Amino acid sequence: PIAGSMVLAAILLKLGGYGMIRIIQILPSSKTDMFIPFITLSLWGAVLANLTCLQQTDLKSLIAYSSISHMGLVVAAISIQTQWSLSGAMALMIAHGFTSSALFCLANTSYERTHTRILILTRGFHNILPMTTTWWLLSNLMNIATPPMMNFTSEFLILSSLFNWCPTTIILLSLSILITSIYSLHIFLSTQMGPTLLNTQTEPAHSREHLLMTLHIIPLILLSMKPELVM
């Protein structure tokens, strides 16, 4: 069920990161070196999860792997134990909670009309549901951390913290950000552009779907205007 995926991505997945933040506070802050394996594996795992996203043909699986890649950045940031990295990790968990939940909601919007999650079969929605295309565009822009969204603020804090800790990490971080932009653009073009393959009449977008997306986008925009509330 799509509701389960939304709750899993927005709340349950982030509880693990929040638990790490709480546990890390009781450990000596000078023992950052003991977390080097975790930082390395989390960054490498984020890159591999992003590469897996490029191979996915199932829309729901693609969004799920996207959540895994973002949590890799969160784990790396928490392990460094600096003020900037912890603030960035907390902000990214909240921002990506809204973003991934919105993407799952949009994926269900497409599934209810096409009864498939295969990307190549869900194309052409720009001509059928133009307002939904706007929601897709905003959600993908948030997913790639476009300014001035809180996603950008959080990823900038994490990137700065990791680069200050070890400049070599910029290689994996840059690769992860690049691949995220590629598959986010791939999602948008695959679902919205091109000729539609639907032969039956498609029902228009419901007000409940627009309300759901509004309740995802507006709070994130408001938090982006005042990010110190969660950092």
Curated annotation (Swiss-Prot):
GO MF annotations, alphabetized: NADH dehydrogenase (ubiquinone) activity; ubiquinone binding
Localization annotation: Mitochondrion membrane
Annotated EC: 7.1.1.2
Catalytic reaction(s) noted: a ubiquinone + NADH + 5 H(+)(in) = a ubiquinol + NAD(+) + 4 H(+)(out)
Residues passing through the membrane, by range: 1-21, 34-54, 62-82, 86-106, 118-138, 169-189, 211-231
Keywords (A to Z) from UniProt: Electron transport, Membrane, Mitochondrion, NAD, Respiratory chain, Translocase, Transmembrane, Transmembrane helix, Transport, Ubiquinone
Topology within the bilayer: Multi-pass membrane protein
Protein name as catalogued: NADH-ubiquinone oxidoreductase chain 4
Lineage, top ranks: Eukaryota, Metazoa, Chordata, Craniata, Vertebrata
